[in-house]
Amino acid sequence: MKQAVIVDCIRTPMGRSKAGVFRNVRAETLSAELMKGLLLRNPQLDPNTIEDVIWGCVQQTLEQGFNIARNASLLAGIPKTAGAVTVNRLCGSSMEAIHQAARAIMTGMGDTFIIGGVEHMGHVPMNHGVDFHPGLANNVAKASGMMGLTAEMLGKLHGITREQQDAFAVRSHQRAHAATVEGRFAKEIYGIEGHDANGALIKVLHDEVIRPETSMESLAALRPVFDPANGTVTAGTSSALSDGASAMLVMEESKARALGLPIRARIRSMAVAGCDAAIMGYGPVPATQKALARAGITVNDLDVIELNEAFAAQSLPCVKDLGLLDVVEDKINLNGGAIALGHPLGCSGARISTTLINLMEHKDATLGLATMCIGLGQGIATVFERV
C-alpha cells in the first residue's frame, strides 16, 4: 500500500470573531491565501499535478456556501484541472479532509492533494440557520444539540470540578502565550492581511485571541453559562470564538521524495468513532483507541498529543480515560489549545495536526496523536509518525 505523507502544513493566525482582525476578510480569502502559501513554499511542486482540493467547513452557507473549496481554489489560481470538494464532519471536518486525501493516496486515486479547512465564525455564526428534525428528540437527549450542556454532563459523570477546569484553561492560555513569545508558532503561522482596531490594513502574524492575563482568580469570577443554577462550565473554560483557516500539502511519499520535497510526517493510522450524543465530547476516547490499535501501538508510545479543547470539562474526562492524566504537562497540548486559540470549526482538525507536527519537530519526537470530539457524538483521531 502506498504511503501518505505531510509535506507542508500552515495556518492563519486565529482572529477574534467579534470585531477581530479578520472582520473584513472573507472565509474564501483566508482559505485561498493558505493554498497560495503552500504553493509558494514548495516551488518544486507543479500545480497542474494537484488531484483535488479537500476543504473542511461546517456552516456551508453565505460566504462559506456553494462549495467553498472550489471558490477558494479558483481565487488561489490553482489550475482548473484540479478538483475541489467541501467536506463536513462538523468539528472534525478538516481532519476528515486529511483522511480522505490519505485514503485516496493509499488506494492509488491520486498522489497530490491540498487539504484544509476554514470557519469564519464572525461572519457565519455556529447556529446560523440550524433546524434540527423534531424527531431527533425520540433518539437522543434534547441537550445533545447544545454543546455546552453536553460538556456539563460529561464533566459531572467524571467528577471534574470547577477548579480543575479553571486550572486547565489557565494552562492553555499560559502555554499559548509562551509559544507565541518564544516563536514556536512562527513556522506554522502564515501571515494574512487584516485590519487593526482603527481599520488600518496590517499583516497579521500572531494569534489575537490568547489572553495571557488569565488567572484562577479571574476565571473564578465567571458565572456558569450553560447551566446557570448548577453548572461549572464558563465562557473561560470553553473554546474561544475565532476565525481562521488551516492547510496541508498531502502527497504520496515516493512522489514527494522524487521532487525533493520534505517529508514532515507520515500518516500512520486514522479512525473515527461514535458515542452518545449527550456526551459528544467523549468521542476522542474510542477514536483514539481505534487509531492506536490500527497503528499497532499503545498510548504510552505517543510522544506528543494534540487534543482539541472544546471545553475543559470535555477534555479532562478524555485525558483521564485514555490514561494520560500523569503526562499532561509533558505530552498534551504543549502550546496551549482551543480554549486559548479558539475553535473555528472547519479549521480545527488540520490546525491541531499542524501544531502537532511542528511540536514533533521541535521535540524531535517520533509518534504523535491529533484527536478531537465532534458534535452529536463522534470522535476522530490521526496518528502521525516522523520518518
Swiss-Prot record:
SUPFAM superfamilies documented for this protein: Thiolase-like
**Residue positions of the active site:** C91, H343, C373
Superkingdom per UniProt: Bacteria
Mention any one GO cellular component term assigned to this protein in its UniProt record.
cytoplasm
Known pathway: Lipid metabolism; fatty acid beta-oxidation
TM segments? Answer: none
Enzyme Commission (EC) number: 2.3.1.16
| Gene Ontology terms describing biological process | fatty acid beta-oxidation; phenylacetate catabolic process
Keyword Iron in the entry? The reply is no
UniProt subcellular location: Cytoplasm
What Pfam families does the entry give? Thiolase_C, Thiolase_N
Quote the catalytic activity from the record. Answer: an acyl-CoA + acetyl-CoA = a 3-oxoacyl-CoA + CoA
State the UniProt keywords alphabetically.
Answer: Acyltransferase, Cytoplasm, Fatty acid metabolism, Lipid degradation, Lipid metabolism, Transferase
* GO MF annotation: an example: acetyl-CoA C-acyltransferase activity
Q: What does this protein do?
A: Catalyzes the final step of fatty acid oxidation in which acetyl-CoA is released and the CoA ester of a fatty acid two carbons shorter is formed.
Assembly and interaction partners: Heterotetramer of two alpha chains (FadB) and two beta chains (FadA).
Q: Which family does it belong to?
A: Belongs to the thiolase-like superfamily. Thiolase family.
Which PANTHER family is this protein grouped with? 3-KETOACYL-COA THIOLASE FADA (PTHR43853:SF11), 3-KETOACYL-COA THIOLASE, PEROXISOMAL (PTHR43853)
Instruction: Write the protein's name.
Output: 3-ketoacyl-CoA thiolase
Originating species: Shewanella sp. (strain ANA-3)
